From Swiss-Prot:
Signal peptide: none annotated. GO terms for biological process: iron-sulfur cluster assembly; tRNA wobble uridine modification. Interacts with NAR1. This is Probable cytosolic iron-sulfur protein assembly protein 1. It holds the Pfam family WD40. GO terms for cellular component: cytosolic [4Fe-4S] assembly targeting complex; nucleus. WD repeats lie at residues 10-49, 56-108, 135-175, 182-221, 228-275, 302-341, 349-383. Its main location: cytoplasm. Essential component of the cytosolic iron-sulfur (Fe/S) protein assembly machinery. Required for the maturation of extramitochondrial Fe/S proteins. It comes from Candida albicans (strain SC5314 / ATCC MYA-2876) (Yeast). Belongs to the WD repeat CIA1 family. InterPro entries: CIAO1/Cia1, G-protein_beta_WD-40_rep, WD40/YVTN_repeat-like_dom_sf, WD40_repeat_dom_sf, WD40_rpt. Keywords: Cytoplasm, Nucleus, Repeat, WD repeat.
Length: 383
């Protein structure tokens, strides 16, 4: 059952995407009105506005992504105050990176770290522009950080995927370490694996591409092509290995398409012994790991118009999808590769299209589903 918990009128124009911080109860929006807004995920505090970031981009902000904490979301550094940072990709072909200064509070650093969920999500923090990243020739369609916050991926209508490297502690410089030209059309989305340096891109050319560094850690290249959709692939997300339904011997990916389908793809994971054996080969014959991906499942057909967004919960293993028909659909896996519909919510944003769904946790750690639509609303749902 999908029940509306709260509705936020975030913008007077379309909300393209939403990002949730991996460890803090805070979300960010991306809108056609060229601004980003941050809200605290606290029902007790009535989901207050934390910050508004504007006057930087000349055109729509299409995508936002919070940087994970140092050490990753699963194992953040416990003795380090990791200040939140946000990347925003725009149709003006640039990416902005935002962050906050260390809070000016009367506590010592240990107390600040212990209470960071409150202190770092306070409206009293000032969000500052830290960097503008330039490189793409056309609109930036999506941005996403890897699980350690060292790499930022971006994609564009210029058919390319770029990978930028930075020092996750300072975010002072962003160096382009790869420009990947494997797609033949507009690239709609990029998404990193939650705990591995593997990247997926989704495109207007109807394919998904998988990228990984070579064994020596020098070059990034395409190691897998997922063919099967018969229309634009709008979005793809990896399954978290923390999920209660995850199999540690394989990788899985869910994708959403213009062809009205939601698909699950699977590939075997290479074991550490195999990787070590390849490292011991001479570099002249050492090859990148090619990954063979197959369709494991096509989820039950529900959507009548293009599916724009999918989200895979690390907490429950449930998948949510949404798109042009205004429906939110939630699916559960009953046995390996067999999925059933949990619930369908029609008209989740009235007559408007839904551009994004993500899973998030409130400050009380209860999981919710967040949706964003053409109506300018961000809706929070109990599942």
């Amino acid at each position: 059952m999908v029940q509306l918990l709260h509705s936020i009128k975030a913008h007077n124009d379309k909300v393209w995407s939403v990002s949730v911080h991996p460890t803090l109860p805070i979300i960010a929006t991306a809108s056609t009105d060229k601004s980003t807004k941050l809200y605290k995920l606290s029902a007790r505090q009535k989901f207050p506005l934390v910050a508004k970031l504007e006057d930087t981009h000349k055109r729509s902000i299409r995508s936002v992504a919070f940087k994970p904490p140092l050490g990753g979301a699963d194992t953040p550094k416990s003795d380090f105050l990791d200040l939140p940072a946000l990347a925003a990709g725009s149709f003006d072909s640039t990416i902005s990176v935002w962050g906050i200064d260390e809070p000016d509070v009367e506590y010592d650093i240990e107390e600040v770290i212990a209470n960071q969920k409150e202190i770092l999500t306070s409206p009293n923090n000032e969000w500052n522009l830290m960097a503008i990243i330039e490189g793409h020739e056309n609109e930036v369609k999506a941005v996403d950080w890897n699980f350690q916050g060292q790499y930022l991926a971006s994609c564009s209508r210029d058919k390319t995927v770029w990978i930028w490297e930075t020092d996750p502690e300072t975010l002072e410089e962003f160096e382009c370490v790869a420009v990947l030209n494997d797609h033949s059309q507009d690239v709609k989305n990029v998404s990193w694996h939650p705990s591995m340096n593997i990247l997926a891109s989704s495109s207007y050319d109807d394919t998904i591409r998988i990228y990984q560094q070579d064994i020596a850690g020098d070059e990034w290249s395409c190691v897998g092509i997922l063919n099967g959709h018969e229309g634009t692939v709008w979005c793809s997300k990896f399954e978290s290995l923390k999920s209660p339904i995850a199999d540690s011997s394989v990788l899985r990916l869910v994708s959403a398409s213009d062809d009205l389908s939601v698909r699950i793809w699977v590939a075997k994971r290479e074991q550490e012994d195999d990787e070590q054996a390849k490292l011991e080969l001479p570099s002249s014959i050492r090859h990148t790991n090619e990954m063979v991906w197959e369709v494991e499942s096509v989820l039950p057909s529900v959507h009548k118009y293009p599916v724009y967004s999918v989200a895979w919960s690390a907490l429950t293993g449930k998948i949510a999808s949404a798109g042009s028909d205004g429906k939110i659909v939630v699916y559960s896996e009953t046995e390996k590769g067999k999925w059933v519909i949990d619930s369908i919510h029609e008209g989740a944003h009235g007559v408007h299209e839904i551009n994004c769904v993500i899973w998030a946790q409130l400050d009380d750690e209860n999981e919710i589903l967040v949706s964003a639509g053409d109506d300018g609303y961000v809706n929070l749902w109990k599942i």
